[in-house]
Amino acid sequence: MLENLRFSSSRIFFDSRMLKIINDNVLTTKYISNKSIDLIVTSPPYNVDIEYNSHNDKLSYRDYLNFSKNWLSRCFEWLKDDGRFCLNIPLDKNKGGQQSVGADLTTIAKDIGFKYHSTVVWNEGNISRRTAWGSWLSASAPYVIAPVELIVILYKKTWKKTSGSRESDITKEEFMGWTNGLWTFSGESKKKIGHPAPFPIELPRRCIKLFSFVRDTILDPFMGSGSTLIAAYLSKRKGIGVEIDKNYCELAKQRLIKEGKINQLNLIDVGINNC
């Protein structure tokens, strides 16, 4: 596959026949064509003061919603007319004030033009984010925190998918289990992966097999540690990741080699780090 590697820009971390990492800002990147993406699977910053290398995760809530509107608008442009969008976001948050994040981002997406299809509730199982209970053992001001996240399923114009290979690789057992809107599997370890907010490969794997065909193009505009690209590659889909931080691009590359079983020569030996 060495002959398939292309280096057209300093923003392209690597580009092979099946995978592309773009080291760029999702709001300004010019390296994704409009109406070229079959499925977007992503988990954007939650604005809960996580220490990313290259992103301010402590915006005012109004600024966070404006930021979300801007990147969601770009995703809308990139999707094909029968493209889908799996948006992993919190149900709500209490850091910096109680906010209905899931409802607010879904409303913004619909205002942009996305159509709503359904919501999967992800029971993370090992979630542990409690830092306060409000009024302890008192009705004066208790906090209620749901130990779940959402995967909001949106689409651009038509839900029925007619483009692509029309080849599905999902099993009967997977289809029956995953069309149930409650998914239960563990989250990912920050320490193990080396990223402050990784999500498990199982999440994009389910979304990719359920909502796309073999050889479709999958995009993660907040690639992070590369879970979506690994799932895409292992599912015989093309994967594109956008990531503003070069160190996370390198982390994703190393995970693709280790967990995606990518031939290391295809990613390293032709000057990929000269980006």
PLM segments and residue spans:
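Core catalytic lobe of class I
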Residues: L2-E250
